[in-house]
Amino acid sequence: HMESVGRTIAGIAPWLELGPDKTAEGKLRDKYIKMVCKGLKNSVDPHADDYFNSTATRQILVNSAFLIQGLLQAPTQLWGNLDDKTQQRLIEQWKSTRTMKPGNNNWLLFSAMVECGLKSFGNEWNFEVIEKAISSHEQWYKGDGVYGDGENFHLDYYNSYVIHPMLLQVLKVVVKYDSSYQILLDKEWKRFVRYAEIQERMIAPDGSYPVLGRSVSYRSAAFQVLGASALFHQLPSSLKAGQVRGAMTAMLKRLFEQPGTFDKNGWLTIGVCGEQPELGDSYLSTPCVYLCSLGFLPLGLPADDVFWTAPLSPWTSIKAFSGEEFPIDKFMKP
Protein backbone atom coordinates (compact mmCIF):
# COMPACT_ATOMS: atom_id res chain seq x y z
CA HIS A 1 0.00 0.00 0.00
CA MET A 2 3.05 2.23 -0.37
CA GLU A 3 1.52 3.94 -3.40
CA SER A 4 -1.28 5.49 -1.33
CA VAL A 5 1.10 7.25 1.06
CA GLY A 6 2.82 9.84 -1.09
CA ARG A 7 -0.34 10.54 -3.05
CA THR A 8 -2.46 11.13 0.06
CA ILE A 9 0.15 13.31 1.74
CA ALA A 10 0.54 15.42 -1.41
CA GLY A 11 -3.15 16.24 -1.24
CA ILE A 12 -3.58 16.94 2.47
CA ALA A 13 -0.23 18.65 3.12
CA PRO A 14 -1.43 22.23 2.46
CA TRP A 15 -4.28 21.69 4.91
CA LEU A 16 -1.95 20.20 7.53
CA GLU A 17 0.47 23.12 7.11
CA LEU A 18 -2.20 25.40 8.59
CA GLY A 19 -1.21 23.73 11.85
CA PRO A 20 -3.06 22.78 15.04
CA ASP A 21 -5.36 25.20 16.83
CA LYS A 22 -8.27 25.08 19.29
CA THR A 23 -10.97 24.68 16.63
CA ALA A 24 -12.43 21.27 15.81
CA GLU A 25 -10.61 21.33 12.49
CA GLY A 26 -7.38 22.45 14.14
CA LYS A 27 -7.57 19.52 16.55
CA LEU A 28 -8.17 17.19 13.61
CA ARG A 29 -5.08 18.59 11.89
CA ASP A 30 -3.06 17.95 15.04
CA LYS A 31 -4.19 14.32 14.99
CA TYR A 32 -3.28 13.80 11.34
CA ILE A 33 0.04 15.63 11.55
CA LYS A 34 1.08 13.20 14.27
CA MET A 35 -0.25 10.22 12.30
CA VAL A 36 1.59 11.24 9.12
CA CYS A 37 4.87 11.79 10.94
CA LYS A 38 4.59 8.46 12.76
CA GLY A 39 3.70 6.71 9.51
CA LEU A 40 6.66 8.22 7.67
CA LYS A 41 8.95 7.21 10.51
CA ASN A 42 7.76 3.60 10.25
CA SER A 43 7.98 3.62 6.45
CA VAL A 44 11.76 4.03 6.54
CA ASP A 45 12.45 1.97 9.68
CA PRO A 46 13.76 -1.48 8.59
CA HIS A 47 12.45 -2.98 11.83
CA ALA A 48 8.88 -1.67 11.43
CA ASP A 49 6.07 -3.70 9.90
CA ASP A 50 5.25 -0.78 7.60
CA TYR A 51 8.77 -0.50 6.18
CA PHE A 52 8.94 0.35 2.47
CA ASN A 53 11.63 -1.66 0.70
CA SER A 54 13.10 0.98 -1.61
CA THR A 55 14.42 -1.65 -4.01
CA ALA A 56 11.12 -3.48 -4.37
CA THR A 57 9.53 -1.57 -7.25
CA ARG A 58 9.89 1.43 -9.54
CA GLN A 59 6.77 2.79 -7.87
CA ILE A 60 9.01 3.99 -5.04
CA LEU A 61 10.12 6.72 -7.47
CA VAL A 62 6.52 7.79 -8.03
CA ASN A 63 5.70 7.62 -4.32
CA SER A 64 8.82 9.63 -3.47
CA ALA A 65 7.91 12.34 -5.97
CA PHE A 66 4.39 12.78 -4.62
CA LEU A 67 5.64 12.62 -1.03
CA ILE A 68 8.17 15.36 -1.76
CA GLN A 69 5.42 17.40 -3.41
CA GLY A 70 3.56 17.22 -0.11
CA LEU A 71 6.57 17.88 2.13
CA LEU A 72 7.46 20.98 0.11
CA GLN A 73 3.94 22.24 0.84
CA ALA A 74 4.22 21.46 4.56
CA PRO A 75 7.83 22.14 5.55
CA THR A 76 6.88 23.18 9.08
CA GLN A 77 4.16 20.75 10.16
CA LEU A 78 5.44 17.63 8.37
CA TRP A 79 9.15 17.80 7.56
CA GLY A 80 9.81 19.96 10.60
CA ASN A 81 8.16 17.44 12.92
CA LEU A 82 10.20 14.45 11.73
CA ASP A 83 13.16 13.39 13.86
CA ASP A 84 16.66 13.64 12.38
CA LYS A 85 17.01 9.90 11.79
CA THR A 86 13.73 9.72 9.87
CA GLN A 87 14.70 12.73 7.76
CA GLN A 88 18.03 11.13 6.89
CA ARG A 89 16.44 7.79 6.10
CA LEU A 90 13.96 9.47 3.77
CA ILE A 91 16.80 11.27 2.01
CA GLU A 92 18.65 7.98 1.56
CA GLN A 93 15.50 6.35 0.21
CA TRP A 94 15.09 9.16 -2.31
CA LYS A 95 18.70 8.75 -3.39
CA SER A 96 18.04 5.07 -4.05
CA THR A 97 15.58 6.01 -6.80
CA ARG A 98 18.41 7.45 -8.90
CA THR A 99 19.05 3.96 -10.25
CA MET A 100 15.56 3.91 -11.78
CA LYS A 101 15.47 5.31 -15.31
CA PRO A 102 12.26 7.26 -15.95
CA GLY A 103 10.33 7.01 -19.19
CA ASN A 104 10.68 9.84 -21.69
CA ASN A 105 7.36 11.35 -20.67
CA ASN A 106 5.81 12.78 -17.50
CA TRP A 107 8.01 10.39 -15.50
CA LEU A 108 10.91 12.79 -16.04
CA LEU A 109 9.16 15.05 -13.55
CA PHE A 110 9.14 12.32 -10.90
CA SER A 111 12.93 12.17 -11.05
CA ALA A 112 13.16 15.96 -11.11
CA MET A 113 10.93 16.21 -8.03
CA VAL A 114 13.19 13.79 -6.18
CA GLU A 115 16.20 15.96 -6.98
CA CYS A 116 14.32 19.04 -5.78
CA GLY A 117 13.53 17.22 -2.54
CA LEU A 118 17.16 16.27 -2.10
CA LYS A 119 18.20 19.89 -2.64
CA SER A 120 15.51 21.37 -0.40
CA PHE A 121 15.97 18.92 2.47
CA GLY A 122 19.47 17.52 1.91
CA ASN A 123 21.29 20.35 0.13
CA GLU A 124 22.42 18.32 -2.90
CA TRP A 125 21.07 17.51 -6.34
CA ASN A 126 21.86 16.20 -9.77
CA PHE A 127 20.82 19.24 -11.76
CA GLU A 128 21.13 17.47 -15.10
CA VAL A 129 18.05 15.42 -14.21
CA ILE A 130 16.08 18.59 -13.51
CA GLU A 131 17.37 20.34 -16.60
CA LYS A 132 16.29 17.44 -18.80
CA ALA A 133 12.77 17.43 -17.35
CA ILE A 134 12.37 21.18 -17.83
CA SER A 135 13.81 21.34 -21.35
CA SER A 136 11.88 18.26 -22.49
CA HIS A 137 8.55 19.64 -21.35
CA GLU A 138 9.32 22.96 -22.98
CA GLN A 139 9.79 21.06 -26.23
CA TRP A 140 6.58 19.10 -25.65
CA TYR A 141 4.40 22.15 -25.07
CA LYS A 142 1.50 22.01 -27.54
CA GLY A 143 -0.08 25.41 -26.94
CA ASP A 144 -3.05 26.93 -25.10
CA GLY A 145 -1.80 25.73 -21.71
CA VAL A 146 -1.41 22.08 -22.68
CA TYR A 147 1.68 19.83 -22.73
CA GLY A 148 2.21 16.55 -24.50
CA ASP A 149 2.95 13.51 -22.35
CA GLY A 150 6.21 12.99 -24.18
CA GLU A 151 6.34 14.10 -27.81
CA ASN A 152 2.74 13.14 -28.50
CA PHE A 153 -0.43 14.86 -27.39
CA HIS A 154 -2.65 12.70 -25.16
CA LEU A 155 -6.25 13.72 -24.51
CA ASP A 156 -6.30 12.85 -20.81
CA TYR A 157 -5.83 14.52 -17.45
CA TYR A 158 -2.10 14.04 -16.98
CA ASN A 159 -1.55 17.78 -17.38
CA SER A 160 -3.41 18.03 -14.06
CA TYR A 161 -2.38 14.75 -12.41
CA VAL A 162 1.34 15.36 -12.85
CA ILE A 163 2.70 17.70 -15.51
CA HIS A 164 1.60 21.22 -14.56
CA PRO A 165 1.80 20.80 -10.76
CA MET A 166 5.20 19.13 -10.71
CA LEU A 167 6.74 21.32 -13.42
CA LEU A 168 5.61 24.40 -11.52
CA GLN A 169 7.00 23.04 -8.24
CA VAL A 170 10.32 22.10 -9.85
CA LEU A 171 10.71 25.58 -11.34
CA LYS A 172 9.79 27.24 -8.03
CA VAL A 173 12.62 25.33 -6.35
CA VAL A 174 15.10 25.94 -9.17
CA VAL A 175 14.68 29.73 -9.22
CA LYS A 176 15.78 29.85 -5.58
CA TYR A 177 19.24 28.79 -6.76
CA ASP A 178 19.33 30.06 -10.35
CA SER A 179 17.38 33.22 -11.17
CA SER A 180 17.86 32.70 -14.91
CA TYR A 181 14.99 30.19 -14.74
CA GLN A 182 12.55 32.92 -13.68
CA ILE A 183 11.61 33.42 -17.33
CA LEU A 184 10.51 29.79 -17.59
CA LEU A 185 8.68 29.97 -14.26
CA ASP A 186 6.77 33.05 -15.42
CA LYS A 187 5.89 31.27 -18.64
CA GLU A 188 4.70 28.19 -16.75
CA TRP A 189 2.53 30.30 -14.45
CA LYS A 190 0.70 31.71 -17.48
CA ARG A 191 0.18 28.22 -18.91
CA PHE A 192 -0.87 26.88 -15.51
CA VAL A 193 -3.48 29.59 -15.04
CA ARG A 194 -4.80 29.11 -18.58
CA TYR A 195 -5.20 25.38 -17.93
CA ALA A 196 -7.10 26.19 -14.73
CA GLU A 197 -9.42 28.39 -16.76
CA ILE A 198 -10.07 25.50 -19.15
CA GLN A 199 -10.72 23.15 -16.24
CA GLU A 200 -13.43 25.33 -14.73
CA ARG A 201 -15.32 25.19 -18.03
CA MET A 202 -15.18 21.38 -18.05
CA ILE A 203 -17.29 21.00 -14.90
CA ALA A 204 -20.93 20.51 -15.90
CA PRO A 205 -23.88 21.97 -13.95
CA ASP A 206 -24.34 18.64 -12.12
CA GLY A 207 -20.64 18.38 -11.22
CA SER A 208 -19.82 15.75 -13.84
CA TYR A 209 -17.05 16.23 -16.39
CA PRO A 210 -15.72 14.51 -19.55
CA VAL A 211 -14.26 11.07 -18.82
CA LEU A 212 -11.21 11.16 -21.05
CA GLY A 213 -8.00 9.16 -21.32
CA ARG A 214 -6.33 6.74 -18.96
CA SER A 215 -6.18 6.75 -15.16
CA VAL A 216 -9.66 8.23 -14.80
CA SER A 217 -9.95 6.43 -11.44
CA TYR A 218 -7.82 9.21 -10.01
CA ARG A 219 -11.17 10.99 -9.81
CA SER A 220 -10.86 14.54 -8.43
CA ALA A 221 -7.12 14.73 -9.13
CA ALA A 222 -8.28 15.63 -12.63
CA PHE A 223 -8.87 19.11 -11.22
CA GLN A 224 -5.66 19.51 -9.24
CA VAL A 225 -4.61 22.51 -11.34
CA LEU A 226 -7.86 24.39 -10.72
CA GLY A 227 -7.63 23.73 -6.99
CA ALA A 228 -3.95 24.65 -6.88
CA SER A 229 -4.69 27.94 -8.66
CA ALA A 230 -7.09 28.77 -5.85
CA LEU A 231 -4.60 27.65 -3.20
CA PHE A 232 -1.84 29.81 -4.68
CA HIS A 233 -4.17 32.81 -5.20
CA GLN A 234 -3.55 32.57 -8.93
CA LEU A 235 -7.07 32.12 -10.27
CA PRO A 236 -7.61 33.41 -13.82
CA SER A 237 -8.98 36.94 -13.94
CA SER A 238 -12.06 35.56 -15.69
CA LEU A 239 -13.05 33.47 -12.66
CA LYS A 240 -14.47 34.46 -9.28
CA ALA A 241 -13.51 32.57 -6.13
CA GLY A 242 -17.17 31.78 -5.41
CA GLN A 243 -17.77 30.15 -8.77
CA VAL A 244 -14.63 28.01 -8.50
CA ARG A 245 -15.64 26.89 -5.01
CA GLY A 246 -19.09 26.05 -6.32
CA ALA A 247 -17.78 24.13 -9.32
CA MET A 248 -15.28 22.12 -7.30
CA THR A 249 -17.81 21.37 -4.56
CA ALA A 250 -20.29 20.09 -7.14
CA MET A 251 -17.59 17.94 -8.73
CA LEU A 252 -16.54 16.44 -5.39
CA LYS A 253 -20.13 15.72 -4.38
CA ARG A 254 -20.83 14.08 -7.74
CA LEU A 255 -17.84 11.77 -7.29
CA PHE A 256 -17.82 10.90 -3.62
CA GLU A 257 -21.52 10.71 -2.77
CA GLN A 258 -22.06 7.97 -5.34
CA PRO A 259 -22.81 4.57 -3.70
CA GLY A 260 -19.95 2.13 -4.21
CA THR A 261 -17.23 4.77 -4.03
CA PHE A 262 -16.04 3.19 -0.77
CA ASP A 263 -15.99 -0.49 0.12
CA LYS A 264 -17.48 -1.94 3.33
CA ASN A 265 -14.27 -1.11 5.21
CA GLY A 266 -14.20 2.51 4.06
CA TRP A 267 -11.47 2.15 1.43
CA LEU A 268 -11.78 3.79 -1.97
CA THR A 269 -12.72 1.56 -4.87
CA ILE A 270 -11.46 1.72 -8.44
CA GLY A 271 -13.79 3.79 -10.59
CA VAL A 272 -14.82 7.30 -11.57
CA CYS A 273 -18.25 7.41 -9.95
CA GLY A 274 -18.80 4.41 -7.73
CA GLU A 275 -17.10 1.04 -8.12
CA GLN A 276 -16.08 0.42 -11.74
CA PRO A 277 -13.27 -2.17 -11.59
CA GLU A 278 -13.05 -2.40 -15.37
CA LEU A 279 -11.32 1.00 -15.25
CA GLY A 280 -8.25 -0.45 -13.56
CA ASP A 281 -5.07 -0.36 -15.64
CA SER A 282 -2.06 -2.68 -15.39
CA TYR A 283 -0.20 0.00 -13.40
CA LEU A 284 -3.20 1.07 -11.32
CA SER A 285 -4.09 -0.63 -8.04
CA THR A 286 -6.46 0.42 -5.27
CA PRO A 287 -3.81 2.45 -3.38
CA CYS A 288 -3.16 4.49 -6.54
CA VAL A 289 -6.65 5.98 -6.54
CA TYR A 290 -5.79 7.99 -3.44
CA LEU A 291 -4.31 10.50 -5.87
CA CYS A 292 -7.85 11.91 -5.67
CA SER A 293 -6.69 13.73 -2.52
CA LEU A 294 -5.09 16.27 -4.86
CA GLY A 295 -8.58 17.49 -5.66
CA PHE A 296 -8.84 18.91 -2.13
CA LEU A 297 -5.93 21.40 -2.24
CA PRO A 298 -8.08 24.47 -1.45
CA LEU A 299 -8.49 23.09 2.08
CA GLY A 300 -5.04 24.58 2.62
CA LEU A 301 -6.62 28.05 2.59
CA PRO A 302 -7.56 29.47 6.02
CA ALA A 303 -11.22 29.89 6.94
CA ASP A 304 -11.13 33.66 6.40
CA ASP A 305 -9.74 33.40 2.87
CA VAL A 306 -11.85 34.89 0.09
CA PHE A 307 -12.17 31.41 -1.43
CA TRP A 308 -14.41 30.48 1.51
CA THR A 309 -15.98 33.86 2.31
CA ALA A 310 -16.96 34.92 -1.22
CA PRO A 311 -20.62 34.30 -2.03
CA LEU A 312 -21.33 31.28 -4.20
CA SER A 313 -21.89 32.16 -7.83
CA PRO A 314 -22.73 30.03 -10.87
CA TRP A 315 -19.80 28.54 -12.75
CA THR A 316 -19.46 28.82 -16.50
CA SER A 317 -21.45 25.75 -17.55
CA ILE A 318 -24.40 26.71 -15.35
CA LYS A 319 -24.54 30.15 -16.93
CA ALA A 320 -24.06 28.74 -20.42
CA PHE A 321 -26.86 26.18 -20.15
CA SER A 322 -29.25 28.49 -18.33
CA GLY A 323 -29.25 31.07 -21.08
CA GLU A 324 -27.30 33.53 -18.96
CA GLU A 325 -24.55 35.84 -20.09
CA PHE A 326 -21.05 34.38 -19.83
CA PRO A 327 -17.64 35.30 -21.28
CA ILE A 328 -16.38 33.70 -24.47
CA ASP A 329 -13.28 31.54 -24.22
CA LYS A 330 -10.07 32.74 -25.83
CA PHE A 331 -6.95 30.73 -26.58
CA MET A 332 -3.68 31.81 -25.02
CA LYS A 333 -1.25 33.21 -27.52
CA PRO A 334 2.23 31.59 -27.52
Show where each model-derived region lies.
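Structured alpha-helical bundle/scaffold domains in large eukaryotic membrane-trafficking regulators
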Residues: 20, 24, 79, 178, ...
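Alpha-helix boundary/capping detector
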Residues: 93, 225, 318-322
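Long, repeat-rich segments with strong aromatic
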Residues: 11, 153-270, 277-304
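Extended hydrophobic packing segments that form well-structured cores
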Residues: 297-334
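Extreme N-terminal leader/anchor segments
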Residues: 1-41, 45, 323-334
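Glycine- and acidic
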Residues: 21, 49-53, 277
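Aromatic-lined, polymer-binding surfaces characteristic
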Residues: 12-14, 29-189, 201-224
